[in-house]
């Protein structure tokens, strides 16, 4: 059967039309910013917008749905950024075709319709398709083999291959408990000329068999004990990657050869002047324009925090690849028009936002190009002279001063076969982050010349307020209005937004007035009673005097107050566990985590950390009510409340009682300790002499952290073919095996070197009564070189010897001089003479010295020069 060529637009329309004809409601793609899952950075699958339906907390007016969902994988757990441009199928942005049944049809219809669409509509050759099913799912197996007619040898049963019951590539779980069920994946066979084996085989990671469609059958509910019971209304969730399907239907092997990427790559070629359409940098640019444009359309502008920072990383990665192609001026934003022409029909919001997207990307380009060339020069200089690892402090300087995200520097190093000291980068980041953050905010806010009245803060009681704009600042200057796309600061007469203070981050949210929407990314104090709402006007126009609906982001506020209240409980627990000397030295509380610095002169033990966690979680389980009372300072002192570091107190203060903790605090907090949900310490470290730092997470973030750890343990256990409870013993066994093998290898190297040493004696040349030998030893390490050197010195008696070995591009050199000859020849001088010719240096004693080098290509010539050098010394 000849497969017809479908364009990407054809594939989308055909898919939606097919399922619409089967009674499905066509649902538009949701935003890349999930509206119902604060733990998820970006929408990464079609089912995200239906998650609440599957969980039973939402009900739609339809029971069958189909969509083409815009997805992004470039941050958090799901992150493909570093692979984009280097492989045939990795993308930041991609489209997911899907169909869903909410308690309506089930396996039979789902699989039969999938087969019908693939073979009868898209005309894929049936003999090229195979399927997998969960090993125990006889129903799906029978549908494939007995009803659809797929030969049994092309239906593969996959069991629990992930280290536990129901832990399988073919058993899907939304979480550790809740809806779950088997799945059936459809694969396309590219043919035996492509390396790789079928799913479930040792070679399954090859490119021959490519998964194109996954049908998930949610038919069970998983309890905490791991048991499953049937759901009263089973559901279907399917997903098929549009780009992968397009590559098959368009008879190409790489996603970057399909029509939409072909057009974008040609547009990138036009703007950069790069004629080689297969250049990886053009692929990177073509991929990244899709991701960045859709993110701007969905309200994510480049920034230094959260989703905005992921956006900035993607934009700057694309710009750097343009620079690599010789483009030294802004070009990336010019591709928006091409993208809108290609995808605007399918995503009308993209076409409508094209002008705004262009302006946002152009502004970011202009900002980065100001420092890009200087930064690249610094990076090039740091990587000169045979350096194999970019120092962490250099990577941080590039990040902090020149706006180079770490992965951009890593990308440059990767192209040159080098790496980045990421641990060193993190150390430098931690040392300067708080100071840089404080300095930046001080400059920003002090630049605002505000002399008006203060505002009323209502955020303890309300998260939404009708307010009046009393001042606007654009680029640090007072303005009468803000227009769409402008960054600015807005001051309100009344606000529910909490301004950063006492270590708690400022609120995020939005200000709405008619069609105007101002996205608040941070709230900072201009003066003690004047709050500046920092952000970007996404739509419309705002003027001084306008009334707005000020709406705090409820999810971010809730996560922040959980962390803040937990910080108070943790402070009390630390004093109980470590001693009364524990005093707060600083803190940072935001929606992601709490970071708490305190006086203590030794690292916390594991037992102490566990005890603090236990005490805090006990307070959470007690579900005690919190109480905040305003009183004068004298009355507050009588209550015994602790005063917090970094907080300036007035005549009237706020005493917060939460659990057994009592402190002065003006921040926002939970109503009851149980609202915190869960508390987990994730890091403990030293930040200065006598100061320790604890980082912790709460609520959903704590759950996500524990689930990630559990996943890591399960994955490691699966790799080592052990249960999680057996993992520690199994690791010990593997380490013992490694040690035994290392001893065996060392012994074999010694035998090999010894045998080579006997042969090398015959190569020694007599120079004025001194035996001179310069030779290579194959497969030797530094230890073997030294041992062989000692044996040769014993046998040759009066001698000068140089031995060298090569491991990849690295060179190890040993120079030895017998004790009766060190007055004439020094081993240290000799080893440096040889090492200097292979890009290295070394040192040692008069009779033995070692060196390393990086240029193995010149080693033979260096060894040949030894005889002349020794002769000149005699």
From Swiss-Prot:
The keyword RNA-binding applies. Binds 1 zinc ion per subunit. Its EC number is 6.1.1.7. SMART domains: tRNA_SAD. It is an enzyme of class 6 (ligase). GO terms for cellular component: cytosol. GO terms for molecular function: alanine-tRNA ligase activity; aminoacyl-tRNA deacylase activity; ATP binding; tRNA binding; zinc ion binding. Its cofactor is Zn(2+). GO terms for biological process: alanyl-tRNA aminoacylation; negative regulation of DNA-templated transcription. It comes from the Bacteria. Keywords: Aminoacyl-tRNA synthetase, ATP-binding, Cytoplasm, Ligase, Metal-binding, Nucleotide-binding, Protein biosynthesis, RNA-binding, tRNA-binding, Zinc. It is found in: Cytoplasm. Its main location: cytoplasm. Zn(2+) binds at residues 564, 568, 665, 669. It catalyses: tRNA(Ala) + L-alanine + ATP = L-alanyl-tRNA(Ala) + AMP + diphosphate. Belongs to the class-II aminoacyl-tRNA synthetase family. Catalyzes the attachment of alanine to tRNA(Ala) in a two-step reaction: alanine is first activated by ATP to form Ala-AMP and then transferred to the acceptor end of tRNA(Ala). Also edits incorrectly charged Ser-tRNA(Ala) and Gly-tRNA(Ala) via its editing domain. Consists of three domains; the N-terminal catalytic domain, the editing domain and the C-terminal C-Ala domain. The editing domain removes incorrectly charged amino acids, while the C-Ala domain, along with tRNA(Ala), serves as a bridge to cooperatively bring together the editing and aminoacylation centers thus stimulating deacylation of misacylated tRNAs. This is Alanine--tRNA ligase.
């Amino acid at each position: 059967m000849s497969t017809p060529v479908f364009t990407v637009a054809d594939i989308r329309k055909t898919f939606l039309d097919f399922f619409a004809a089967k009674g499905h409601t066509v649902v538009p793609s949701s935003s890349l910013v999930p509206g119902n899952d604060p733990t998820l950075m970006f929408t990464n699958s079609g089912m995200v917008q239906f998650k609440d339906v599957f969980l039973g907390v939402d009900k739609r007016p339809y029971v069958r749905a189909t969509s083409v969902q815009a997805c992004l994988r470039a941050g958090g757990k799901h992150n493909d950024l570093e692979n984009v441009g280097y492989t045939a199928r990795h993308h930041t942005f991609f489209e997911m075709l899907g169909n869903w049944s909410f308690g309506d049809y089930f396996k039979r219809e789902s699989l039969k319709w999938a087969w019908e669409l693939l073979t009868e509509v898209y005309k894929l050759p049936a003999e090229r398709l195979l399927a997998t099913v969960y090993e125990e799912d006889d129903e799906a197996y029978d549908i494939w083999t007995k009803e659809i007619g797929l030969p049994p040898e092309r239906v593969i049963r996959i069991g629990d291959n992930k280290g536990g019951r129901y832990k399988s590539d073919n058993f899907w779980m939304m979480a550790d408990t809740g809806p779950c069920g088997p799945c059936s994946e459809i694969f396309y066979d590219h043919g035996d000329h492509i390396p790789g084996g079928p799913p479930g085989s040792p070679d399954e990671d090859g490119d021959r068999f490519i998964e194109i469609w996954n049908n998930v059958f949610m038919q069970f509910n998983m309890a905490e004990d791991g048991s499953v019971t049937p759901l009263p209304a089973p559901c279907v969730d399917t997903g098929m990657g549009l780009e992968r399907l397009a590559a098959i239907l368009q008879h190409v092997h790489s996603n970057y050869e399909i029509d939409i990427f072909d057009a974008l790559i040609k547009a990138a070629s036009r703007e950069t002047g790069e004629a080689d359409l297969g250049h990886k940098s053009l692929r990177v640019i073509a991929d990244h324009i899709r991701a960045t444009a859709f993110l701007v359309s969905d309200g994510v502008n480049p920034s230094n925090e959260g989703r905005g920072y992921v956006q900035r990383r993607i934009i700057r990665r694309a710009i750097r690849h343009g620079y690599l192609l010789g483009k030294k001026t802004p070009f990336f934003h010019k591709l928006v028009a091409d993208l809108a022409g290609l995808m605007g029909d399918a995503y009308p919001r993209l076409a409508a936002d094209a002008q705004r997207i262009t302006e946002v990307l152009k502004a970011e380009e202009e900002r980065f190009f100001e420092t890009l060339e200087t930064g690249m020069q610094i990076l090039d200089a740091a990587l000169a002279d045979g350096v194999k690892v970019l120092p962490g402090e250099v990577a941080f300087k590039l990040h902090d001063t020149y706006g180079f995200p770490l992965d951009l520097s890593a990308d440059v190093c990767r192209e040159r076969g080098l790496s980045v000291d990421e641990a060193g980068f993190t150390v430098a980041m931690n040392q300067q982050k708080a100071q840089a953050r404080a300095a930046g905010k001080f400059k920003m806010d002090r630049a605002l010349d505000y002399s008006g009245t203060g505002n009323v803060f209502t955020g303890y009681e309300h998260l939404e307020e009708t307010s009046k704009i009393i001042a606007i600042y654009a680029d640090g200057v007072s303005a009468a209005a803000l227009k769409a796309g402008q960054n600015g600061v807005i001051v309100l007469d009344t606000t529910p937004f909490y301004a950063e203070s006492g270590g708690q981050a400022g609120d995020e949210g939005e200000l709405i007035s008619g069609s105007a929407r101002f996205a608040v990314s941070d709230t900072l104090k201009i003066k003690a009673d004047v709050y500046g709402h920092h952000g970007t006007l996404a739509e419309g126009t705002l003027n001084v005097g306008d009334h707005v609906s000020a709406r705090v982001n409820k999810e971010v506020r809730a996560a922040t107050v959980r962390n803040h209240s937990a910080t108070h409980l943790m402070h009390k627990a630390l004093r109980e566990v470590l001693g009364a000397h524990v005093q707060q030295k600083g803190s940072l509380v935001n929606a992601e985590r709490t970071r708490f610095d305190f006086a203590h002169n030794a690292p916390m033990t594991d037992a102490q950390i566990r005890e603090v966690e236990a005490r805090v979680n006990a307070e959470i389980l007690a579900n005690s009510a919190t109480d905040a009372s305003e009183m004068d300072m004298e009355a507050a002192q009588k209550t015994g409340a602790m005063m917090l570091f970094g907080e300036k107190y007035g005549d009237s203060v706020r005493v917060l009682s939460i659990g057994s903790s009592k402190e002065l605090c003006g921040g926002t907090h939970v109503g009851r300790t149980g609202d915190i949900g869960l508390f987990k310490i994730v890091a403990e470290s030293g930040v200065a002499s006598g100061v320790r730092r604890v980082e912790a997470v709460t609520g959903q973030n704590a759950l996500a952290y524990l689930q990630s750890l559990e996943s890591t343990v399960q994955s490691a256990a699966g790799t080592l073919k052990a249960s999680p409870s057996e993992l520690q013993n199994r690791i010990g066994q593997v380490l013992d095996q490694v040690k035994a093998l290392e001893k065996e290898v060392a012994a074999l190297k010694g035998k090999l070197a010894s045998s080579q040493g006997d042969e090398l004696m015959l190569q020694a040349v007599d120079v004025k009564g001194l035996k001179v030998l310069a030779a290579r030893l194959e497969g030797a390490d530094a230890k073997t070189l030294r041992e062989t050197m000692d044996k040769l010195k014993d046998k040759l008696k009066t001698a000068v010897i140089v031995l060298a070995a090569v491991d990849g591009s690295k060179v190890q050199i040993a120079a030895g001089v017998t004790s009766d000859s060190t007055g004439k020849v020094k081993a240290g001088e000799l080893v440096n003479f040889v090492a200097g010719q292979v890009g290295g240096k070394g040192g040692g004693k008069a009779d033995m010295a070692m060196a390393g080098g990086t240029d193995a290509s010149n080693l033979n010539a260096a060894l040949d020069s030894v005889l002349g050098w020794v002769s000149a010394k005699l």
